[in-house]
């Protein structure tokens, strides 16, 4: 039974800023707040008067063809189809087999790499009071304020997509003292980088490897609105700002990576032009404009995206005036009401992270988004296809950020497809292209093969793995339905898909203890262990985030499938296997699709309790992974979990016509703790959006739709038609 929350006891909070009364330390991913424009990522930290910006560039990687001659992206030198046939024969005979002979070479795989730190040192700052730093999620601007005996200081930092630079603006109520700016690269050998300066800028150029072959070149400039004196021996620019109360610094960066040069025609080099001219141009261009113009254009761009969707939840704990680190520290998963203000704040932060790390001209966000302070990021800061990469996109389309997903499709076209065509030919003797679980930015595709298959990160190498069968089912349906929209002219391909679909094993088998089976193998092989709390829910990918089980099999309305999913989730535990945030938000979304409000909300609360750091970023808490390592997919997956509590919106399969009615359910798992909340701008499949609100029990009672097809039936969880 839902508990009653009196809305009159609290007001709806805007929940639009993260703030702290303490400066962030060098432990940036646990304490600092993030900014970005897709290409550049920034984490401001450091004490007043010695503020630093930790900088990243989305393309800066070590490894790959820049550092390894003859780099092959994990592919073999010659065809492996005979070995593949032998492995398959072994599996058909024994049920399982050894596919190690097919594994790709990981030499030169590399890692996402920190760009630099920029220090802005202000002379004479001591006896600081009234310190506050905040990130406004409505504007994407990070503001630090503090007072000294000389006056009040304010610094604003933001990363502009229109200008392709980040801006640091310093203001003081008194005239400024000397300000010194300089770069350093503390995670790399000093022989690999060089800090220089001129009268109006500080600069750092570096390379990831001296060679041969010479590694990737990177370049970053911080250009000042007030000229100064360059110390060429240190690369420090000393700015005498005593006649001014403000200073603007524009930061730009680039590399010689070129995503369009990863084809056979370019020998998969990914080698582009030296970034020097580009970096000089964008920083000069930005500084030629007024800071107010740069700010206005940034806010228009950022806020236009952020304001496309609004989630309002009640501030039942009076949390609005409490800093983020305290809210996180005091949060308890076992407190059933949670803290709706914080839960909404983290939802908004997830959208901010996506806006800041996924743009039309950038790579998609990797496992660290675009923020890593180290030389070797955890898990290389790469892309994991089994769940993590797709989790990054769970909240994009429904919350009005669909245009930003172009980054991942560009990455697939430029990075996966060219080398993946070689993988398909060498490993499978087939046409088309293929990629496997772990990818870098250099077209690495060759690790584990699809068939033979495995269930991600556990179990045997076998055939007919549930994870893959459910995905293939969904891919086939998508191809059939998308062909007309895309203007597909390959009639042979479509005929093959349509002929194969009825014969396809679709990954729905219920086991002896009532679970969705993870492998097609008979139970006598004893791989289906009840109580296996592995982090992945691979056999439920067709329940969420997919819909082969939940929609194509009508599982959302089928008691037998619902029971099997429920049994599987209970067996899998609450997500403490490695105590990662992403395993919990996935469970939350699955429970929400079962209309199980209690468990969906608990998993959300457990994520905050166990995995959200003082910065609002998701950190590992233990297990067999690096303790405290930052991994961004839980921040993005959090969006998907909350959206699953707010809506069930799934496509029909290809047997249905355009005239068939599709049902959308609003509020399948809204907790009573969110009483009186509302949503504006939730985008639905097929176009259009819906606004809705709910009562003190979490039951949606009001809704209005804009641009939604008449064939879409919108109901609440009790089946009441709303629109």
Curated annotation (Swiss-Prot):
- Give the main location: secreted
Does the keyword section mention Signal? yes
Gene Ontology MF term list: alpha-L-fucosidase activity
Which InterPro entries is this protein grouped with?
6-hairpin_glycosidase_sf (IPR008928), 6hp_glycosidase-like_sf (IPR012341), AFCA-like_C (IPR049053), Alpha-L-fucosidase (IPR016518), GH95_cat (IPR054363), GH95_N_dom (IPR027414)
Query: Pfam families, per this entry?
Result: Glyco_hyd_65N_2 (PF14498), Glyco_hydro_95_C (PF21307), Glyco_hydro_95_cat (PF22124)
Where is this chain's protein located in or outside the cell?
Secreted
Question: Would you tell me the protein name for this molecule?
Answer: Probable alpha-fucosidase A
Q: By which gene is this protein encoded?
A: afcA
């Amino acid at each position: 039974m839902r508990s009653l929350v009196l809305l009159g006891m609290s007001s709806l909070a805007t929940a639009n800023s993260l703030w702290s009364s303490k400066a962030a330390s060098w432990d940036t991913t646990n304490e600092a707040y993030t900014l970005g424009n897709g290409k550049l990522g920034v984490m401001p930290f450091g004490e007043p008067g010695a503020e630093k910006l930790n900088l990243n560039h989305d393309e800066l990687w070590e490894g790959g063809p820049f550092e390894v001659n003859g780099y092959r992206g994990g592919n073999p030198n010659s065809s492996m189809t005979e070995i593949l046939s032998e492995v398959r024969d072994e599996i058909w005979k024994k049920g399982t087999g050894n596919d190690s002979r097919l594994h790709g070479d990981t030499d030169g795989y590399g890692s996402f790499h920190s760009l630099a730190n920029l220090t802005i040192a202000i002379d004479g700052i001591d006896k600081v009071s009234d310190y506050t730093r905040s990130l406004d999620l409505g504007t994407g601007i990070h503001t630090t304020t503090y007072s000294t005996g000389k006056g009040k200081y304010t610094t604003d930092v933001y990363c502009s997509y229109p200008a392709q630079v980040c801006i640091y603006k310093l203001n003081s109520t008194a005239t400024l003292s000397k300000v010194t700016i300089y770069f350093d690269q503390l995670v790399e050998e000093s022989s690999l980088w060089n800090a220089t300066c001129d009268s109006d800028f500080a600069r750092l150029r570096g390379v990831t490897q001296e060679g041969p072959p010479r590694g990737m070149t990177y370049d970053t400039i911080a250009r000042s609105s007030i000229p100064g004196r360059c110390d060429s021996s240190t690369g420090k620019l000393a700015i005498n700002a005593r006649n001014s109360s403000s200073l603007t610094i524009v930061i730009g960066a680039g590399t010689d990576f070129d995503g369009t040069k990863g084809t056979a025609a370019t020998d998969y080099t990914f080698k582009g032009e030296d970034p020097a001219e580009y970096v000089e141009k964008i920083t000069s261009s930005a500084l030629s404009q007024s800071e107010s113009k740069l700010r206005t254009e940034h806010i228009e761009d950022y806020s236009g995206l952020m304001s496309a969707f609004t989630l309002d939840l009640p501030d039942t704990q009076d949390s609005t005036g409490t800093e983020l680190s305290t809210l996180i520290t005091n949060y308890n998963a076992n407190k059933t009401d949670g803290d709706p203000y914080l839960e909404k704040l983290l939802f908004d932060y997830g959208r901010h992270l996506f806006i800041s790390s996924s743009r039309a001209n950038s790579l998609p966000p990797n496992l660290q988004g675009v923020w890593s302070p180290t030389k070797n990021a955890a898990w290389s800061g790469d892309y994991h296809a089994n769940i993590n990469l797709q989790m990054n996109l769970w909240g994009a389309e429904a919350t009005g950020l669909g245009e930003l997903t172009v980054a991942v499709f560009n990455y697939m076209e430029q990075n996966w497809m060219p080398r993946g065509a070689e993988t398909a030919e060498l490993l499978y003797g087939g046409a088309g292209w293929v990629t496997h679980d772990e990818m870098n930015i250099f077209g690495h595709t060759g690790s584990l093969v699809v068939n033979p298959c495995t269930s991600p990160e556990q179990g045997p190498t076998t055939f007919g793995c549930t994870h893959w069968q459910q995905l293939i089912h969904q891919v086939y349906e998508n191809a059939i339905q998308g062909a007309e929209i895309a203007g597909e002219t390959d009639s042979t391909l479509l005929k093959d898909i349509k002929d194969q679909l009825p014969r396809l094993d679709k990954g729905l088998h219920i086991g002896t203890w009532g679970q969705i089976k993870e492998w097609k193998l008979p139970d006598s092989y004893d791989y289906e262990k009840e109580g296996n709390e592995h982090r992945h829910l691979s056999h439920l990918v067709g329940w969420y985030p997919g819909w082969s089980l939940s929609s194509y099999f009508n599982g959302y309305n089928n008691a037998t499938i619902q029971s099997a999913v429920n049994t599987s989730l209970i067996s899998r535990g609450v997500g403490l296997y490695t105590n990662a945030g992403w395993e919990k938000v996935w469970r939350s979304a699955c429970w929400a699709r079962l209309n199980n409000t209690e468990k969906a909300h608990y998993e959300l609360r457990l994520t905050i309790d166990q995995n959200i750091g003082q910065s609002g970023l998701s950190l590992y808490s233990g297990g067999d992974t690096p303790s405290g390592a930052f991994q961004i997919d839980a921040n993005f997956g959090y969006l998907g979990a909350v959206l699953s509590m707010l809506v069930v919106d799934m496509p029909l399969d290809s047997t249905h016509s355009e005239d068939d009615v599709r049902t959308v359910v609003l509020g399948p798992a809204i907790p009573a703790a969110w009483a009186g909340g509302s949503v504006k701008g939730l985008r639905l499949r097929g176009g259009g959006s819906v606004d809705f609100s709910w009562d003190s029990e979490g039951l949606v009672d009001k809704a209005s739709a804009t641009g939604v097809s008449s064939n879409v039936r919108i109901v609440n969880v009790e089946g009441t038609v709303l629109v």
